[in-house]
UniProtKB/Swiss-Prot annotation:
GO terms for biological process: 'de novo' cotranslational protein folding; cell division; chaperone-mediated protein folding; protein transport; protein unfolding. This is Trigger factor. Its EC number is 5.2.1.8. PROSITE patterns: FKBP_PPIASE. Consists of 3 domains; the N-terminus binds the ribosome, the middle domain has PPIase activity, while the C-terminus has intrinsic chaperone activity on its own. It is found in: Cytoplasm. Pfam families: FKBP_C, Trigger_C, Trigger_N. The gene is tig. The lineage of its organism: Bacteria, Bacillati, Bacillota, Bacilli, Lactobacillales.
Amino acid sequence: MSVSFENKETNRGVLTFTISQDQIKPELDRVFKSVKKSLNVPGFRKGHLPRPIFDQKFGEESLYQDVMNALLPNAYEAAVKEAGLEVVAQPKIDVTSMEKGQDWVITAEVVTKPEVKLGDYKNLEVSVDVEKEVTDADVEERIERERNNLAELVIKEAAAENGDTVVIDFVGSIDGVEFDGGKGENFSLGLGSGQFIPGFEDQLVGHSAGETVDVIVTFPEDYQAEDLAGKEAKFVTTIHEVKAKEVPALDDELAKDIDEEVETLADLKEKYRKELAAAKEEAYKDAVEGAAIDTAVENAEIVELPEEMIHEEVHRSVNEFLGNLQRQGINPDMYFQITGTTQEDLHNQYQAEAESRTKTNLVIEAVAKAEGFDASEEEIQKEVEQLAADYNMEVAQVQNLLSADMLKHDITIKKAVELITSTATVK
């Protein structure tokens, strides 16, 4: 294989490489054997057409595209490795020569990993705004939240207040004309929940069951239904029931209802205190790690971050987001219709985050390289076993999904993050 690389501009260039006849000939034979199985040529049994007759009738060149498709991926990968390049985006491939009996010549316009000039990344001083101490108020808030989850709604005769739930029928109209989606029956609405258009819930406060209220509201200018945005509407609203939240008493029985593993309220408080302490400690560690890495990134200089890297990160994030939605039964078209957004809006939403994440990844990789971090076979095996346990998979499944190089990369990244974080001090 002949390989050359020509820089065109920062982080961009043209990689030229060849695929030799030593590789082409056996692949031609393989492709021919596969193709001839489906050929029907008069005078020959199906699948038994001699190669010379095929070449004469169809031409050897008719096999070239299949041969190229088979050989190109490995040839490109080998050329990148031989040229010592770190390519960070899909190449633009051009086959410049496919002459019979000659080595094939291919060019690839590639984007390479930008140079990272590291600044200080060890012994950093960082600030974090996360409290480690668990207060009595923290414990009480946790218990109160669980207590409210066990609350029951009971019908009340008095007028509705914020925090109550009302059961209503409503019919909306604009200039006396009803509109789609503006009608509901026996709808349970929590007053103060913000479920409805701003101003709707407030106008029901002070009213009782059996009353009919004309609720006048204006749809927000950015409302998802453009035909309603900015318009004033009247909702004729009939209140059927007013319900108040009734919370259980704060006692040992409540504690047992919340958590069957405890016997008393004191036990529950102690359990929650330990859980909150562990959670706060974890949050504190995460905050220190985030602050230390952010500082290391700020101290570094990245020479012209390629747009392609950011685009690929945006694409990955968008696909991950939409994939999660689909697993919940929400397809992309439904999501965009509900939110009144577009695919482009979603890409723009992830743009800044993608740029930040790309810079962070580059700096951490540069730290790992500068420190000469590597991963032993023992460390790789331990990582595989840990991933298998985390995702409830067989070890062999993990090994099939992740290459040794991918695992080695992840391990060295973890080492770099640990170095940056463990040497940092909090102001």
